[in-house]
Amino acid sequence: ASDVYKRQLLCCFENNILIEIPFFAELNFLKQALFELQKQSYSPVLAHPERYVSLSGETEIKDLKLRGAKLQLNALSLIGYYGKDVKKKANEWLKKGFYDFIGTDAHNEYHLSELQKLRLGKKELKEWMNIKISQQRLIGL
């Protein structure tokens, strides 16, 4: 195993660990990373999967979910901040209930101001609220 997997990592709430991979990484790289982290009793949460090139369809997402991966939606993806294709994937995957967490990925005030453009349909809003409730339970709110 790589030295990265041997180091102690900072986790919160049920050994969840947020991971990010290069946007053009091969799917096998991601699967191996998930496997190595799970061997160490971590519960990987993949940040903004809608932005990864190798995760282009539902088949890949369903496979990752079956492998125990959790997914974190980047809220900026829903407004088209990263392009139309990413927005389309994010909205479809939100409607289908693939996400376990929602994050802003806001690194500055501009990102936060962009989030004010967010508008959700009924189905997306329902899934958003389900995720929010699950997150609150997880952290004890």
Model-derived regions: residue spans:
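Short amphipathic alpha-helical segments
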Residues: 58-59, 114-116
